[in-house]
């Protein structure tokens, strides 16, 4: 169906990257609640994954994620999404409006991929 696969990954990024390559995944993979370091973030991004950040995050990792690959979440937090987004924006050194634009760009990328894959599957039928 091409829907994004939302993953929780703790200390298994190498295995996750290997699995994505092995199965030749075409749908987007989003690692939610990402708390890893910048090096792990770069590896996951290089493997084509998206990263979602919540209340707890590694500031250096957050700074290496480009627009179009970044999401913000509340998952396990009692904080409101706008509070988390404000902290993320401050950490990235950007205004909240720019962060909002970056996240919207990510959503557009995810939806575009989902619709493109769904369209390809319909044409095969």
Task: Please place each PLM-identified region on the residue numbering.
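Divalent metal-binding pocket/active-site signature
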Residues: 1-47, 93-97, 116
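Mid-to-C-terminal alpha-helical segments outside catalytic/metal-binding sites
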Residues: 1, 85-125
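Short, structured coil segments at secondary-structure junctions
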Residues: 47, 65-66
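Histidine/acidic-residue-rich catalytic or RNA/ligand-binding cores of hydrolases
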Residues: 16-18, 41, 62, 80-86
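Active-site neighborhood of phospho(di)ester-bond hydrolases with catalytic His/Asp-centered motifs
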Residues: 6-7, 30-32, 52-54, 71-74
């Amino acid at each position: 169906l091409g829907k994004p696969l939302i993953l929780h990954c703790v200390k298994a990024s190498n295995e996750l990257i290997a699995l994505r390559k092995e199965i030749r995944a075409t749908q987007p993979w989003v690692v939610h609640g990402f708390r890893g370091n910048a090096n792990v973030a770069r590896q996951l991004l290089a493997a084509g994954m998206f990263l979602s950040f919540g209340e707890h995050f590694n500031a250096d990792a957050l700074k290496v994620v480009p627009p179009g690959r970044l999401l913000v979440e509340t998952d396990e937090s009692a904080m409101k999404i706008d509070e988390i987004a404000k902290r993320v924006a401050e950490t990235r050194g950007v205004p909240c409006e720019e962060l909002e634009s970056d996240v919207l760009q990510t959503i557009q990328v995810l939806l575009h991929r989902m619709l493109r894959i769904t369209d390809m599957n319909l044409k095969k039928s």
